Amino acid sequence: MTSTHHSRRSRETPQPEMSIGRYTRLDEIGRGSFATVYQGVHTKTRTYVAIKSVNLSKLNKKLKDNLSSEIHILKGLYHPHIVALIDCHETTSHIHLVMEYCALGDLSLFIKRRDTLGDHRYTRDMIAKYPNPPGGALNEVVVRHFLKQLASALKFLRDRNLIHRDIKPQNLLLCPSPSSYRSGVTQVVPFKGSEDSFNPATGLESLPLLKIADFGFARSLPATSLAETLCGSPLYMAPEILRYEKYDAKADLWSVGTVLYEMVVGKPPFRATNHVELLRKIEKGEDRIKFPEENPASDEIKALIRALLKRNPVERLNFPDFFQNGVITSPIPGLVADDLPSIPQGPPADPETAEATPRPDSRSGATVPGGTEREREGPSLPKGDTGLTQRPPSQNQRFGTPQTTTPMRRIGSGDRPPSTPKESTPPMTYPQRPSAVSHATAPGRQELVDRNATFTAMERQKGRNTFSEGSPQIDRQADKLREERERAAQDVAFERDYVVVEKRAVEVNAFADELAHSPRIQGNISRGAQTGALSRRSTVHGPTPSNPSPPQATVGKAMQVLSGRSRADSMHNRQGSYERRYGQSPTSATSAISKALNMASGRLFGMGFSPPLAITKGGRSPPLAYNPFPAYPAHGSLMIGDGAKSNLALDEDTKTVQILEECATRSDVVYGFAEVKYKQLVPLAPSVQTDPSSKLNLAGERENPDSADGGLTVDAIVTLSEEALVLYVKALSLLAKSMDIAGAWWARKNRGDGFGDSAMSRANGASTLAGTRINNVVQWIRNRFNEVLEKGEFVRLKLIEAQKRLPPDHPSHPDNHSVGSSLGSGASVDVVVSPGVSAEKLMYDRALEMSRTAAINELTGEDLSGCEIAYVTAIRMLEAVLENGEVPRFGQDKDDTSKDSDKIVLDAVQADERQVVIKLLTIQAVVASIRSRLAALRKKLAILAKRAPTPSANVPSKMASSNPVSVGATPPK
């Protein structure tokens, strides 16, 4: 599809030619995670195509099924501004997708090389007529031309209820101008996917032709997985996607705004080193889009960009208004005489009529050759394509405009006559595969629906559009709020294929949505809101969260925690998983667990594990009691502490809360350990360093800005990636178990032990509190699960990349991997870790190291409060090692599950390693020993606290409170 992105390997070693059907595969021109793109040529007509070869061994079953479904849909999409799928061939090892060839590459390269376009034979005339301004990127005539063609393609997709979801300059491919084909300037002639493939539906025929590429593959065949995309270049993603919020087709309009800005200015509107910083910049900008003073863009273009780049999708320009915008519908100003229309054609650039209006040159014999040959070829597509190669006229009509020309179609089976109105009587239907959704704000159900692509076009969207158009401006905001909330409960969200445990991710998010939006749970939350219960930050300007509102009023909102106590070091908003990672102050970059891990950390590869950050702003002060959960009413609050047995008689709901919180806390300890490894692989960006004036790396050495890996060797990267990956997988398993515990509780409630007049309305209110607390923990688990999934995928890709850089004789080099040593199930690419690397072994060694270091410090009287944290963390980590995947049965005492603990088998610890662990000491004995040390330490701390004078408000206390870790204590993240 592009001829400009030649890989270095293809230039050094020419690829052998290969016959694929009627085409010959030539040199490699691009490479992605799942596919390699080659230049190809038709064996008879010698016209060019792009051949995308997908390696089936890198796809799991779901990705293969989704790919087949998407190919079936793509064969029915024929539009001048969408790269067409011409043919498809499948072998035992690959699927070869034959697509239209775009000789000018993509728009990002076009903008980057704007200063040299005058030297290229395909763009020399364009620059002569419309030179690029010195203070901008592209001439506004060219910008409007590309925007019209992009809008035409989006209108075509919108009419078919399709969303691209990955609009960016890299996916906008360019072909030489249609006039250059007729004049003979263009020597590389592409094969035509349809009769009108290179006849523009709108815009100018003397300028390059824009086509959207990779449509549909965002769901079934991503160029990169979710984590890689977010950690790579999410510069064009809508903020609602970055926030893991509900999103719909309006996300495409944000992307259009970023592309339009880049065409005008020469760079994206928001740039950052990672998606966390990117989202922060978008939020900080508060919809104030600035342009360079010397930029010559017109006010009309700037106003359109500002209308598209609205953080709130409700405030963002909608599709009808976008398609009717003057920039889209009005003639392009500033045309040279040669490009002025010779005859009146009404609005010459209106996408509503341009596609149905015959062009003087659209049937010229001098157009791109290959179409007539296509008629002589006979069938070339696989079975089942007959119904897709002949398009009914009704699918080419725009906004009810009568069809006046031969419909745009692919001629693929002999000399087929043009479609007649009779052929359009049976409406074309496209089977829509079940969406792998993880609804962020509302429960959803996966269904297989055959949607009528002709006139059954998502009535809820049509209703939204007509509603917003016909409403007065004064009521527009309220009407949009109501309509967006109703639609948010139905539309598809997060249709992304996580490479790791994708199905589990869908289940986790679906259950969290169901619990969060249950009227019974929501009623409890609203009653407890005044005491600090969970509230929601509206993504739109709606009523304040504290006001009582119906349960559906929370749909489409993101999480926010309102702590019961106002404290300078604890006030924070939870918005997805990102802001917990990088807070707004240096204190939020760590936690008590991080401190405990740092205290026990040795030196690895000459680097420290993380910077020694102060817990609070006052320097040395009592460490905050660590707990990862949101703050909520603590009526008889359970104290997690160190997990020791309590003699209190607990009802079933309270037991569920206790077990759930303990399991989630163990997962958080493992997550904190994994973060130690992760932060070495991904050094902190300059904007989130604790000391802005310091440019030192984690080892205290001067940072090298040119070092992408922070100075780590390849062996170190492999080791860190392996350890981080197995720890993240362990954390995911604990989070999944926590969600299973909550799911079992919820199932029992739905079977009969309901809320309201029964269990949840007891006099002491314990069950009401339990429901609220379980919901809060479930929402935390959901956010953490998604975050760990994303980071785990990043580490997986980092590991695969680093292993390829190892010497060929290294045991971890991909060529030396055995089939049976791969990690993970269902992953698109198998991950192989070195023998002996397991999460349980790492956690066991770390727990022993932490407890021993804490014991030494306790004996010397140093940092007793830190010793307490280290003991608790070590206990939790060892409990996580002993954790199995079974959900506890209720009615069974917690201690009953550990009666057979001597028979526990550590799944990931190999036989020889298990023997080493057993020889040292049984884990249960280690836990008991650490608990005894912790009890003695707390007695010592209590005695010291009684003897010590009460510290003043300005002098932080050296010793911490002896109270166990409370559920309600939420440290800054």
UniProtKB/Swiss-Prot annotation:
Keywords from the named record: ATP-binding, Autophagy, Cytoplasm, Kinase, Membrane, Nucleotide-binding, Protein transport, Serine/threonine-protein kinase, Transferase, Transport
One Gene Ontology cellular component annotation held by this UniProt entry: cytoplasm
MF annotations from Gene Ontology: ATP binding; protein serine kinase activity; protein serine/threonine kinase activity
Membrane topology listed for this record: Peripheral membrane protein
CDD domains, per the entry: STKc_ATG1_ULK_like (cd14009)
Cellular localization per UniProt: Cytoplasm; Preautophagosomal structure membrane
Comp. bias intervals (Basic and acidic residues): 566-582
Active site, per annotation: D166
PROSITE patterns: PROTEIN_KINASE_ATP, PROTEIN_KINASE_DOM, PROTEIN_KINASE_ST
Reactions the enzyme catalyzes: L-seryl-[protein] + ATP = O-phospho-L-seryl-[protein] + ADP + H(+); L-threonyl-[protein] + ATP = O-phospho-L-threonyl-[protein] + ADP + H(+)
PANTHER family tied to this protein: NON-SPECIFIC SERINE_THREONINE PROTEIN KINASE, SERINE/THREONINE-PROTEIN KINASE UNC-51-RELATED
Similarity comment: Belongs to the protein kinase superfamily. Ser/Thr protein kinase family. APG1/unc-51/ULK1 subfamily.
Function: Serine/threonine protein kinase involved in the cytoplasm to vacuole transport (Cvt) and found to be essential in autophagy, where it is required for the formation of autophagosomes. Involved in the clearance of protein aggregates which cannot be efficiently cleared by the proteasome. Required for selective autophagic degradation of the nucleus (nucleophagy) as well as for mitophagy which contributes to regulate mitochondrial quantity and quality by eliminating the mitochondria to a basal level to fulfill cellular energy requirements and preventing excess ROS production.
Record protein name field: Serine/threonine-protein kinase atg1
Source organism of the structure: Aspergillus fumigatus (strain ATCC MYA-4609 / CBS 101355 / FGSC A1100 / Af293)
